[in-house]
Amino acid sequence: MTDGVDTDEALMLRFAGGDVQAFEELYRRHELRVWRYLQRNLDNRATTDELMQEVWFAVARAARGYRPIARFTTWLLTLAHNRLVDTLRATRHHERLPTVADGSDGLSLVEQLAADSQTEPLERAQSQQHAAALLAAIEQLPPEQRQAFLLHAEGELTLAEIAQVTSTSFETAKSRLRYARSKLRRLLREYA
């Protein structure tokens, strides 16, 4: 505990001991992060919602055997990533181009970009246009690069954690993130 707030790992251990409120707190803390990661890699909200349920059921099933070897976030996003990959393989959606204007509530990147102390309507509108361009550019990334980028940007994972989540080497994760950033820079330069 730090400053009276349980770490995610401590909450998971409490949940393993039967504390349902600890699970509810973990869900509250990580629901949007996991949902956004899945939604940005899938075609529709229904599939995302279904996978969300599967991920959190998996968390509940694995609670008794949970060992805080890695950060909880890394472990959780590994569960989400594995279910995502299984779904993509089963449905052959490797070339997915998601819809930005799907009315989703999980536009964290847009919110962060648009909310950067923009108070003037013109500045806010321009910022929202830039954010929409970023999301459109993210959609154009190959699946492996998009996943690496989103795990870093949304999941706040390190390269080592991205490698762990995606079951790749550190160098592969590093390359995917580097190529993703390079392509995003190129695509966004074309936008400007």
At which residue positions do the language-model features occur?
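Sigma70-family region 2
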Residues: 16-17, 40-45, 54-71, 90-92
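Amphipathic, Lys/Arg- and hydrophobic-enriched alpha-helical face
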Residues: 27-45, 62, 138, 183, ...
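Helix-turn-helix DNA-binding module
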Residues: 132-172
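Arg/Lys-rich amphipathic alpha helix in sigma70-family domain 2
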Residues: 61-68, 78-99, 127
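Short, Lys/Arg-enriched C-terminal cap helix and immediately downstream tail that follows
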Residues: 38, 89-92, 141, 146, ...
